[in-house]
Amino acid sequence: MDPGWGQRDVGWAALLILFAASLLTVFAWLLQYARGLWLARARGDRGPGPALAGEPAGSLRELGVWRSLLRLRATRAGAAEEPGVRGLLASLFAFKSFRENWQRAWVRALNEQACRNGSSIQIAFEEVPQLPPRASISHVTCVDQSEHTMVLRCQLSAEEVRFPVSVTQQSPAAVSMETYHVTLTLPPTQLEVNLEEIPGEGLLISWAFTDRPDLSLTVLPKLQARERGEEQVELSTIEELIKDAIVSTQPAMMVNLRACSAPGGLVPSEKPPMMPQAQPAIPRPNRLFLRQLRASHLGNELEGTEELCCVAELDNPMQQKWTKPARAGSEVEWTEDLALDLGPQSRELTLKVLRSSSCGDTELLGQATLPVGSPSRPLSRRQLCPLTPGPGKALGPAATMAVELHYEEGSPRNLGTPTSSTPRPSITPTKKIELDRTIMPDGTIVTTVTTVQSRPRIDGKLDSPSRSPSKVEVTEKTTTVLSESSGPSNTSHSSSRDSHLSNGLDPVAETAIRQLTEPSGRVAKKTPTKRSTLIISGVSKVPIAQDELALSLGYAASLEASVQDDAGTSGGPSSPPSDPPAMSPGPLDALSSPTSVQEADETTRSDISERPSVDDIESETGSTGALETRSLKDHKVSFLRSGTKLIFRRRPRQKEAGLSQSHDDLSNATATPSVRKKAGSFSRRLIKRFSFKSKPKANGNPSPQL
């Protein structure tokens, strides 16, 4: 045999074996691929999600390269592992706010679903059913996922849930309402949760039962059979209504996904510090006032003998306020105000219009629902909403309910008090003191002290000074010094008392009137108390003997004048005093002229307590005189009037030898009584007090009081 032939046979045999191995390899890959398709189709009938999620990770290597790529793609795009999703839901339900919002959304959806049946028997879930501690969520899987949506399925199981249900039965004769206690036993039930991302708002979460669960209900009335009315609702009917509401409802809630700004350099694992804006975590109690309730276009078929009332109900905390009955008609208005306490979870306000007949029966005509509790809403607004007719009732096509909503923040207050948005005036009384001082050429100092006391009114009453200390503001003007040329008279001091100006004014009186009537720097008449005090002081070098003689003569003349006045008022004829120490007619008439008019302000009793006593007045150096004049509003006010009795009292003081510090210009002490009458008109140390007191016009022109 040729040896070359044997080598060629071995080469061909190796090639054949290699070809057969290749065919077997390709055939094996085809079998694996077919097996994978068959398994996927078989498991697709039971749901692709659980099949993909339930297989172990080792199966990815058994199905070949293509199947592994497909399975990896499905794992990344679709199903998540059960422990991860379950941990996410468990973390969300660990937060109290999320759990409360979830329960509240469920109860709200149950009430809405119960109102859609249109039956004469209406049920309402009054309280949020608390999920028992032994409730569990298991077998969480992701069955569908896209860019903005995700569908999860889980198994919910709980032992017992207890909650009250209010049942309202409406009939043409009457309306009855009873409360029932419901005990719900929930067997393991499959729940489908839909997650949808809404741009700009957050994550919308909705859930519903995939199949009708076998619910076990126990309904018991709150009242005993003897306490209940004659017409009772069958318990089986209530059970069916509750079951239909639970199974058919699909609650939904919104979760905020907005990012919060954190300080720079914050480590994710560390606990973020408390931000300043997060300090007022506890909401303040608010109140909601309902005013000007008005129902319009109710229809003309309402009888005049019936009455309508409005009921306001708040969802959380549950509150109910009733208005007084009003006569029925096409348009009804309730004038009283209703106050409701808002809580952090208050969301809806329901207004119901009830009709009551003469026999005492009530029935629901219509109702309207308003959203409340939003911080972005204005504090006060007018709301108009349509009325939904009650079961078996027909209202007008344009039946509406109008109400004015008024929010008040902070602690509850009475109606009519100002809200927090209204700026309230300060309760601290203020007192402003203005000093105006003028120095005459002859050395006489004319000082005007104007005191303006403000006592702000709160609720129409004055605050107590003992509880609100006064705030004193002292303003002193620049002292004015009049020279010999600029003064009203360029004569000497001794002759300035005798020679007046052409209009009859004394230079000191003219300065005093100018200071009292000068409007510059005076505050507007916005306070209940305003008082001006005039102080005229000066120094004249007069011998002591002349000063004492003038004081004695003036004191004796004033006493004689007072005795004669008393005798004249008792009925006996008497002549007027021959030489009273009164003002000369010239200055008096000038002071009574319109030039010296000063508008009087209303005074309070507190002004009386602030007046200086006689001892304070007499403590001044020299001769003093105190007088009060009446003030009639919008009439002329004269600071000094003829006939005013001035009693000069002299306190013993040390004087310089040969000189006197009297306020009277007694340079002509030995002159005639008429000269002394003029000279005694103004003293250099005279304190005149003006207290404006409004008296009735019937009193006429009373004599001033000393």
Swiss-Prot record:
Keyword Endoplasmic reticulum annotated: yes
Q: Start and end of every C2 domain?
A: 268-389
What SUPFAM superfamilies is this protein classified in? C2 domain (Calcium/lipid-binding domain, CaLB)
Q: Matching InterPro entries, A to Z?
A: C2_dom, C2_domain_sf, C2CD2/C2CD2L, SMP_C2CD2L
Which residues lie within the region annotated Disordered? Answer: 409-430, 449-504, 564-635, 648-682
Which residues are modified to Phosphoserine?
A: 59, 358, 374, 411, 464, 468, 470, 613, 619, 623, 638, 660, 662, 674
**Residue stretches spanning the membrane:** 10-30
Pfam families membership: C2, SMP_C2CD2L
Q: What residue spans carry the region label Association with the cell membrane?
A: 415-706
Keywords for this protein: Cell membrane, Endoplasmic reticulum, Lipid transport, Lipid-binding, Membrane, Phosphoprotein, Transmembrane, Transmembrane helix, Transport
For side Cytoplasmic, which residue ranges?
A: 31-706
UniProt domain SMP-LBD: residue ranges: 76-260
According to the lineage, what is the superkingdom? Eukaryota
- MF term (GO), any: phosphatidylinositol binding
Q: Which residues carry this modification: Phosphothreonine?
A: 417, 419, 428, 621
Query: What PTMs does it carry?
Result: Phosphorylation at the C-terminus acidifies the protein and leads to disassociation from the acidic cell membrane. Reassociates with the cell membrane upon dephosphorylation.
Q: Which GO terms describe its cellular component?
A: cortical endoplasmic reticulum; endoplasmic reticulum membrane; endoplasmic reticulum-plasma membrane contact site; plasma membrane
Its domain description in UniProt is: The SMP-LBD domain is a lipid transport module, which binds glycerolipids with a preference for phosphatidylinositol (PI).
How does the annotation summarize its subunit structure? Homodimer.
The protein's name in its UniProt record: Phospholipid transfer protein C2CD2L
Gene source species: Homo sapiens
Q: What broad taxonomic lineage does this protein's source fall under? A: Eukaryota, Metazoa, Chordata, Craniata, Vertebrata
Gene for this chain: C2CD2L
